[in-house]
Curated annotation (Swiss-Prot):
Gene Ontology cellular-component annotations: DNA-directed RNA polymerase complex; host cell cytoplasm; virion component
Membrane-crossing residue ranges in chain numbering: none
Pfam families named in the record: RNA_pol_L_2 (PF13656)
Assembly notes: Part of the viral DNA-directed RNA polymerase that consists of 8 polII-like subunits (RPB1, RPB2, RPB3, RPB5, RPB6, RPB7, RPB9, RPB10), a capping enzyme and a termination factor.
Taxonomic path: Viruses, Varidnaviria, Bamfordvirae, Nucleocytoviricota, Pokkesviricetes
Organism listed in the record: African swine fever virus (isolate Tick/Malawi/Lil 20-1/1983) (ASFV)
Family assignment from sequence similarity: In the N-terminal section; belongs to the archaeal RpoD/eukaryotic RPB3 RNA polymerase subunit family. In the C-terminal section; belongs to the archaeal RpoL/eukaryotic RPB11/RPC19 RNA polymerase subunit family.
GO term, biological process aspect, one: DNA-templated transcription
Keyword annotations from UniProtKB, A to Z: DNA-directed RNA polymerase, Early protein, Host cytoplasm, Transcription, Viral transcription, Virion
Protein name: DNA-directed RNA polymerase RPB3-11 homolog
Main location: host cell
GO function terms (MF aspect): protein dimerization activity
Induction: Expressed in the early phase of the viral replicative cycle.
Length: 359
């Protein structure tokens, strides 16, 4: 397969210390003399030779369908008897701690917050007030010291133990989102000029991307917290992990029909008439992301297919794929296998391209 990953631009968002106003503000508020240890990183990527569903799938997985980490408070960690500021409720503080942008590689670290306001003014609590109480010594910070956690009135205290690192995915809790601001566009569809779009309220493309089958795409996103010395390595790891997540989810579908001659509740095959076969495949805990990718790639593999579609069933946490084709049961399974192998090969090639392009 030809090179899919054509180009990448990686741009960290740095503090402009050349601006005296920004420099003085950083020094006054946070005692900063240099860049923060973690920075947001904008990434713009160009892909060629793949369908719209593949780029959409990569975008969705990078944002909220890939395992990531957040900070959370263990049950009983918020010490109610020692926390005397009634405005700083457990839920308020938990939400703030959940959404601290972090760069973590495991779940072994534990932190605590023990803050007392002895002044006559309101005290702002920042992430720099967190102290590590368990886990290996850090080679670099996993969060910036400047994120606001809460506030303390004069004479009040806030005590929290057992702030730990939790693993999950963004579609179940937004704090686990890996990338933010994901967006993609198609470079091989002619667009209206910007002024014309605003004046005539046009969508942008002169032809619908649903019917034009674009093959040249640009995907943009932002990783909120990446260590300064490891920007390229972190971006490369994130992108490769996203490819592996998609490959793993596609491979799990293979296992459903590998022994299709044996009765399986996840796979129903039957003949509609002398020519057509209908397959209904139920995939647990799957989403629109993989459904759309499968549907598009099966259509590409079998252009004369009678029907292919999917339905997500949220209350059952499953996705149901339906295929109807003029073929025997064995031939239909063979065609489905080829379609899935094409998807796996596509993302394996993309993973290889990522290694080649991001040093």
């Amino acid at each position: 397969m030809e090179k899919i990953f054509q180009n990448v631009e990686i741009k960290p968002l740095l503090i402009d210390f050349s601006n005296p106003f920004i420099k003085n503000a950083a020094k006054k508020l946070f005692q900063l003399e240099e860049q923060l240890p973690l920075v947001p990183v904008n990434v713009v990527m160009d892909f060629k030779g793949i369908n719209r569903a593949a780029v959409h799938g990569l975008s969705r997985v990078l944002q909220d369908e890939i395992p990531n980490y957040m900070l959370d408070i263990k049950p009983g960690g918020y010490k109610i008897e020692d926390s005397t500021d009634l405005f700083m409720t457990e839920q308020f503080i938990r939400n703030r701690i959940n959404f601290i942008p972090i760069y973590a590689e495991n779940e072994s670290l534990v932190f605590a917050l023990r803050s007392l306001n002895n002044s006559c003014e309101v005290k702002t609590i920042y992430t720099r007030d967190l102290i590590q109480v368990a886990g290996p010594k850090l080679k670099y910070p996993i969060f910036n010291p400047t994120f606001e956690i809460g506030f303390l009135q004069p004479g009040k205290s806030l005590i929290i133990e057992d702030i730990y690192i939790k693993k999950g995915i963004g579609r179940k809790h937004a704090a686990f989102n890996l990338a933010v601001k994901t967006h993609f566009s198609h470079l091989d569809i002619e667009q209206y000029p910007t002024d014309k779009k605003e004046y005539m309220a046009l969508s942008g493309y002169k032809q619908s991307s649903m019917t034009s089958d674009p093959r040249h795409h640009r995907l943009g996103l932002c990783f909120p917290a990446v260590p300064m010395p490891r920007i390229n390595k972190a971006v490369r790891t994130y992108l490769k992990n996203a490819c592996r997540v998609i490959i793993g989810r596609i491979q799990s579908i293979q296992k459903i029909y590998e022994n299709f001659e044996e009765p399986q509740p996840e796979l129903v095959l039957f003949s509609m008439d002398e020519e057509k076969t209908k397959a209904i495949i139920t995939i647990k805990d799957e989403t629109h992301t993989i459904g759309n990718l499968l549907k598009t790639c099966i259509y590409e593999m079998i252009p004369d297919i009678s029907f292919v579609g999917y339905q997500c069933v949220p209350h059952k946490q499953e996705m149901v794929l339906t295929i109807i084709h003029k073929a025997s049961q064995e031939d239909l399974i063979t065609l489905l296998e080829k379609s899935i192998q094409n998807i796996i090969q596509m993302f394996q090639t993309l993973e290889k391209n990522i290694d080649e392009l991001i040093a």
